[in-house]
């Protein structure tokens, strides 16, 4: 604009100068004409100055408007970019939430199981006309399949369901092959809730794994025995313990006088563990009482498994002659021989109930190595003796002494793991039956196992 005004002023000056020169030359212009031209020039200059001022103001306004527009455009671009980012983040979050929802239940559930294939040989003696003779050898093959589900209900509550072959036998989940390839039964092996009510404290409700500590390879309890009822466990620092109450039989209004004759087990175990010899040593004492067992029949399949019984009249029902108030003590010492773990153990039990003659059981043994990781092995041996009424026999190991009390003898064990979760095991029992009562009989049992875990 300033260049235009300057050009106009110069043009006007030149015009005025030319007019004045022409007037002097021609001598015809009057003084009034010159003044008129000067007045017009002054007016023109004033108008030009006003136009220049107006133009400058317009330029300033335009600059401000342009700056504001640029700012608005920048803000719009920023908002658009933020919107895109939020949409992308929202899409990612939605996808992650979807994944979490889809896998949340899976993270709280664990599946486990194992499968065992066994070849078994049993050789025993028998009485024939009051003389001892060899019974026919028995060969059979058996399978065991177990499957479990552990679900975290809350941070301190876990629910477990487990199923196993073997029918309803409380001491065995083995299924003998045969029956012309019939389908084999599968039963509820465990169903319980584990509530961690405090640090080191748990309550188990339902059909649960045996919570009693068993030293070493002791066979006072069968490994398949899963009691039913309540257990409260404590394990903190060097101290541990378990109080338990288990159902045996529920016999509503079965007594002749109209009273109930429900048989139960109640007991308490306490122990401590501490470091010794480069390993851990565990000492424990356990006491249980079989309530309403004497004179009753808390027996699976009416089989006392060696405990003393009697019958009434012509009844074929076996009734327990004695009560069972059993105290147990056990010790287990863990150490190492070179790089191999070594476990030494011993346990002792006695039935404190009245008038029991054969009331003592004991065992001791060792285990060297551990067949767990690839190319690892284990071996062990122990001796065990169980008097006829030393323990309540319904949960006694089902293999030692043909699954009965009134037996003693040795057990040899060996195992090898070619790879992890796969082991080959051999166990040999050479026992004596009827060590307290009747005629002694030799009993041999060989088990060859292939075990898979998953």
Report the location of each language-model feature:
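Short amphipathic alpha-helices and their capping/turn segments at secondary-structure boundaries
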Residues: 97-107, 148-150, 270-274
């Amino acid at each position: 604009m300033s260049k235009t005004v300057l050009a106009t002023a110069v043009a006007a000056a030149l015009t005025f100068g030319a007019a004045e020169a022409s007037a002097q030359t021609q001598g015809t212009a009057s003084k009034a004409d010159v003044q008129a031209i000067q007045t017009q020039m002054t007016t023109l200059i004033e108008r030009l100055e006003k136009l220049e001022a107006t133009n400058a103001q317009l330029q300033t306004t335009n600059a401000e408007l342009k700056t504001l527009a640029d700012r608005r455009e920048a803000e719009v671009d920023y908002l658009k970019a933020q919107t895109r980012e939020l949409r992308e983040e929202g899409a990612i979050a939605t996808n992650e939430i979807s994944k979490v929802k889809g896998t949340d239940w899976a993270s709280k559930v664990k599946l486990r199981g194992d499968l065992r294939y066994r070849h078994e040989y049993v050789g025993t003696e028998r009485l024939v006309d009051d003389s001892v003779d060899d019974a026919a050898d028995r060969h059979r093959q058996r399978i065991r399949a177990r499957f479990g589900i552990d679900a975290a209900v809350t941070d301190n509550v876990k629910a477990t369901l487990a199923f196993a072959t073997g029918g309803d036998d409380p001491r065995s989940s083995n299924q003998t092959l045969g029956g012309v390839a019939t389908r084999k039964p599968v039963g509820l092996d465990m169903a319980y809730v584990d509530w961690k009510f405090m640090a080191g404290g748990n309550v188990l409700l339902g059909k649960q794994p045996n919570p009693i500590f068993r030293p070493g390879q002791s066979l006072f309890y069968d490994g398949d025995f899963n009691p039913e009822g309540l257990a409260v466990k404590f394990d903190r620092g060097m101290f541990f313990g378990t109080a338990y109450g288990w159902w045996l039989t529920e016999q509503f209004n079965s007594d002749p006088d109209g009273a109930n004759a429900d048989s139960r087990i109640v007991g308490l175990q306490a122990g401590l563990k501490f470091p010794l010899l480069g390993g851990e040593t565990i000492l424990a004492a356990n006491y249980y009482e079989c309530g309403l067992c004497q004179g009753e029949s808390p027996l699976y399949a009416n089989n006392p498994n060696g405990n003393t019984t009697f019958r009434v009249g012509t009844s074929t029902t076996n009734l327990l002659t004695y009560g069972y108030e059993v105290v147990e003590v056990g010790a287990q010492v863990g150490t190492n021989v070179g790089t191999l773990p070594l476990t030494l153990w011993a346990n002792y039990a006695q039935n404190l109930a009245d008038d029991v003659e054969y009331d003592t059981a004991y065992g001791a043994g060792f285990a060297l190595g551990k067949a767990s990781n690839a190319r690892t092995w284990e071996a062990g041996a122990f001796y065990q003796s169980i008097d006829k009424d030393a323990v309540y026999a319904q949960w006694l190991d089902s293999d030692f002494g043909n699954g009965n009390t009134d037996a003693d003898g040795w057990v040899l064990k060996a195992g090898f793991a070619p790879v992890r979760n796969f082991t080959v095991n051999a166990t040999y029992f050479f026992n004596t039956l009827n060590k307290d009562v009747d005629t002694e009989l030799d009993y041999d049992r060989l088990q060859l196992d292939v075990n898979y875990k998953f």
